[in-house]
């Protein structure tokens, strides 16, 4: 989380480079989902991106762990820690996920620019967080061989 220091700035000294990253194998009953909203297919710059990873407790719909990351709504990718804490240890109901999505929108630090206004980006964060947490939870409940993309 501390590797990104700002736009175009990384935690590297002069002459250093990142040779690779290690991503640990997720626990059982973990699912993830990611989406990015762009104004058109030909444009590579996202208006908003939202990723979610959910680990469910065995044989229940209770979230053991939740990670939500927001892109293009702050100078660097941003963890929505308040939204995560609303869900962690809770049954993942539609209402609880909606509450967390509102919190994620409040945590975002969007700007207004030519692609979208601050208000529009915040609303996109809310809607896409709700969708991605739901999709990640669905994936966590589904055996890997039967999963579909979000």
Which ranges hold each PLM region?
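C-terminal structural segment of proteins
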Residues: 1-150
